[in-house]
């Protein structure tokens, strides 16, 4: 009988789902198996050897056992280096008393892809800085294997949430003629020609900084929509939380106010956390053991917390009270209208609320032109979700649906040119609507405990020189 080609993940799933009575049938059907993967470790004592093989189908490895009395090419296999690609035929044997529930006893093997002895990923601890220098190889390291599995799972969880809630997925353009945030930090696009800035599109264009302005018109046709894609900002911010290319999740909901917006943010975040804790067990156990030993407790706390709501004004009052009582911030000058720093946000969520909190109703000068002005004339219906140990995680707002108010605000900030079409959406059947943005990479940092945005992106793009 030909050996059955199997994935390691399928074997783990089969064994986990069966009881003892069905084990014999499984073993009979998988008596001899064919597996392919990459060597994580290889050790032997001269008579018996052990290889940890990962085939890419799951985070777990499978243990290959090779015996000198059984395998003719024992010496050859014992000298196979970490990182080599291997094809193996062997017998599947259950090992209920060992760390792993099964092993494969090698009968035949083929060295599919040898590896040079100078392979950078040897069996030892490597610094994150070193691993960033070999971004093309680091997916094979345990940490990044787990990170990119989680990146995939988080992306699917986002789509799952919005699709289950009846949202339509909209593809917004990467090339745009506007700067949605009005900050001017865009990457211009040029062509070869006499007028490289304008020859192709007839005007200056850039890579998008946000899909929001382009997804809003679709909310006014399909009610609930979202976009999920890459965005670009030419900021020279050499921090652990900033990148020049990153992914954004940006939903928009018609006939929704700020409270509806916050309800959706809370539900979305809790869904992502729930999926991580209950469907990504191996990866989460790894992160909790080796990256952040408080990770699972923190996520469980957020999952089961009520997200409180506090006005920006109340937050300023709490910070002023803290300073008066002797608390020292790096920026101790607290005043209404200031842009809160991470230390202030963390104080509010960790010391005052002791849990997740939405800060709402910010001064309008601090926020984008499209946010709905409140009746006081000083604030806008905006919200930022603050979570312990991170600070701001999500930003959202009710959008200004009143044509005259929005037009006046756009004229005040000088962004009318090129956005006449955006104003049209308020002239022709506009309605109250709200939306928010989640930085996908920062969300991934939060769920994994990773401390640098460069370590949750496959090939990070920052203001550093590009190698890949």
Residue spans for each PLM region:
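Class II aminoacyl-tRNA synthetase-like tRNA-binding/catalytic domains
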Residues: 2-18, 24-254
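Generic, well-ordered alpha-helical scaffold segments in large soluble proteins
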Residues: 38, 80, 156-165, 210-213, ...
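Secondary-structure capping and boundary motifs in well-ordered enzyme cores
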Residues: 78, 150, 179, 183, ...
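Short coil/turn segments at secondary-structure boundaries
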Residues: 120-122, 151, 168-175, 229-230, ...
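Short, charged, low-complexity patches
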Residues: 151, 258-266
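Metal-assisted phosphate- and nucleotidyl-transfer catalytic regions
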Residues: 180-186, 193-194, 267-387, 412-413, ...
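TRNA-recognition modules of translation machinery and tRNA-sensing kinases, especially anticodon-binding
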Residues: 220-230, 243-257, 272, 354-468
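Inter-helical turn/loop segments and adjacent helix faces that build the functional surface
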Residues: 255-259, 278-280
